[in-house]
Amino acid sequence: MERVERSAIRVEPFSSYLERRRTGPIFPVVTAGGFVFVSGLPPFDPATGEASRRPFREQAQITLEQMKRCLEAAGSSLERVVECNIYCTDAARFDEFNEVFARYFPSGSPARIFLCVGAFPGSFDLEVDCIAVL
């Protein structure tokens, strides 16, 4: 089997947060085969770099802004996202999330799922990952 070349990209404050909480190399963004893979991002507090509980709409906006920042660090953009996965602790937040999401994808949504999960290991309600074309 042919080896796939991957490049990990550091994006602060996300990289430092992941390193403080996990063992082993974990990166918020990896590129491979002409694609950008953004790891699941909770809503990091921009001032502290820590995941924190905020009102849900604010969590959604912060998370999507972070995703945009990660994509741009890799040389891509929201317009090049082909798949987006949303993990949320409350299915009743579906419409509320969609209102925020639509502002980031005004010309049409990528393929996506909105999955309800039990809980996260932190004080937040939302995590988003995506795949984009370079």
Regions found by a protein language model. Name each.
Residues 1-65, 69-82, 88-134:
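N-terminal presequence-like segments and the immediate start of the first folded domain
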